[in-house]
Amino acid sequence: MNVILFGPPGAGKGTQAQYVVERFGIPQISTGDMLRAAVKNCTPLGLKAKEIMDAGGLVSDEIVLGIVADRLSCEDCGTGFVLDGFPRTIPQAEALIEILACLGKQTDHVISLEVSNDEITRRLSGRRTCPSCGKGFHVLFAPPRKAGVCDFCGADLVQRGDDHPESICNRLSVYEKQTSPLKAFYAQKGLLRAVDGSLPVEQIQLQIRKVLEGCSSDCA
């Protein structure tokens, strides 16, 4: 079962990807993790990527696609995988089709977690982090006992720069520009399934299970 998972920042994509991993026994694969692993393991492509990143450049599609191809050919992907954060462009999506074809595979499901911009802003703008011990809080969903103060070490909590409303708006705009063409691409192929990401976690998981297992509406 080969799955691609889309979702804007704050949609809970990581949580749902982990659910797919645990339920179906397939690895979660992200381009960030793949790049870091390739660099750490000093693979030929990893060394090229490190040289570019150290110089402050953007890693080319050629290198990224090579790393993706290497990762998808690993033994643990034999029964499937869930791709997180890839592809990001139509050329990458087209190249992924070729990579999978060379491995005798194809994309089986493309899931898009749909959450309104207002809800995303509410989720992200409420996040707070302790700069001392690293613990995370949320002003609405997991508030500290004393406002603005870490429960564990007493340090003042901070808000990440990219969790400010202006930054969130920019991130959502970038996401929309990236994924709208991809959604159309996969919808045309009959692979795209939208899942309501504003529901409680368990209900989102049930929707994803229905998609991946082909369950009817009464699947429990």
From Swiss-Prot:
Gene3D superfamilies membership: P-loop containing nucleotide triphosphate hydrolases
GO cellular-component term (any): cytoplasm
EC code(s) of this entry: 2.7.4.3
InterPro entries, A to Z: Adenyl_kin_sub (IPR006259), Adenylat/UMP-CMP_kin (IPR000850), Adenylat_kinase_CS (IPR033690), Adenylate_kinase_lid-dom (IPR007862), P-loop_NTPase (IPR027417)
Binding-site positions, AMP: 31, 36, 57-59, 85-88, 92, 160, 171
Region of interest: LID: 126-163
SUPFAM superfamilies assigned: P-loop containing nucleoside triphosphate hydrolases (SSF52540)
Catalytic activity annotation: AMP + ATP = 2 ADP
A molecular-function term among this protein's GO annotations: ATP binding
Chain spans, region NMP: 30-59
Pathway assigned to this chain's UniProt record: Purine metabolism; AMP biosynthesis via salvage pathway; AMP from ADP: step 1/1
Compartment(s) where it occurs, according to its Swiss-Prot or TrEMBL record: Cytoplasm
Enzyme class: transferase
Amino-acid positions noted as binding ATP in the UniProt annotation, renumbered to this chain: 10-15, 127, 199
Binding, Zn(2+): 130, 133, 150, 153
Keywords assigned by UniProt, alphabetized: ATP-binding, Cytoplasm, Kinase, Metal-binding, Nucleotide biosynthesis, Nucleotide-binding, Transferase, Zinc
Superkingdom of source: Bacteria
Any GO BP annotation: AMP salvage
UniProt xrefs under CDD domains: ADK (cd01428)
Domain note: Consists of three domains, a large central CORE domain and two small peripheral domains, NMPbind and LID, which undergo movements during catalysis. The LID domain closes over the site of phosphoryl transfer upon ATP binding. Assembling and dissambling the active center during each catalytic cycle provides an effective means to prevent ATP hydrolysis. Some bacteria have evolved a zinc-coordinating structure that stabilizes the LID domain.
UniProt family annotation: Belongs to the adenylate kinase family.
Described function: Catalyzes the reversible transfer of the terminal phosphate group between ATP and AMP. Plays an important role in cellular energy homeostasis and in adenine nucleotide metabolism.
Subunit structure, as described in the record: Monomer.
Protein name: Adenylate kinase
